[in-house]
């Protein structure tokens, strides 16, 4: 560090120290489920091992989620209509509950939706919700 700004140097060293303790990540290890997780904007992000771009990717997904929710609902609509008989997009969006995103698998899962208590709703996605695949409602 340059001696011209000793206060700044201490600040930077403090940040580096903090990052070392948390392994430089916002992810927290969940022993019960044996994975790492973090939450941004009410969205849970999980992974088995932390890759260097996961935090940035999680932030981008969290920022895009609200905007992409209507497209997610449209994509899930046929399965939801068949399983639960619900066709109103607003009702579906409000019923999905807290999303969980698996960064390793590229899946978006709803474990806490209010359409019933037996099934989980899951789908795969690419990029920042740019394409959707393989939706399923599992019981």
Sequence positions of predicted segments:
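Amphipathic protein-protein interaction modules
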Residues: 63-119
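General structural signal for secondary-structure boundaries
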Residues: 54-55, 59, 85-89, 125-131
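Long, contiguous N-terminal structural blocks used for assembly/anchoring
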Residues: 5-82
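Acidic, proline/glycine-rich low-complexity IDRs
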Residues: 5-27, 32, 36-38, 91, ...
């Amino acid at each position: 560090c340059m001696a011209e700004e000793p206060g700044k140097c201490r600040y930077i060293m403090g940040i580096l120290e903090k990052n070392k303790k948390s392994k430089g990540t916002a992810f927290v290890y969940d022993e019960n489920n044996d994975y790492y997780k973090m939450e941004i904007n009410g969205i849970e992000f999980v992974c088995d091992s932390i890759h260097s771009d996961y935090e940035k990717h999680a932030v981008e997904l969290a920022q895009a989620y609200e905007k992409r929710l209507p497209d997610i609902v449209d994509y899930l609509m046929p399965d939801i209509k068949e399983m639960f008989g619900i066709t109103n997009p607003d009702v579906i969006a409000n019923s999905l509950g807290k999303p969980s995103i698996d960064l390793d698998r590229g899946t978006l899962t709803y474990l806490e939706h209010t359409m019933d208590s037996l099934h989980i709703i899951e789908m795969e996605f690419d990029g920042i919700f740019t394409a959707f695949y393989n939706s399923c409602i599992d019981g």
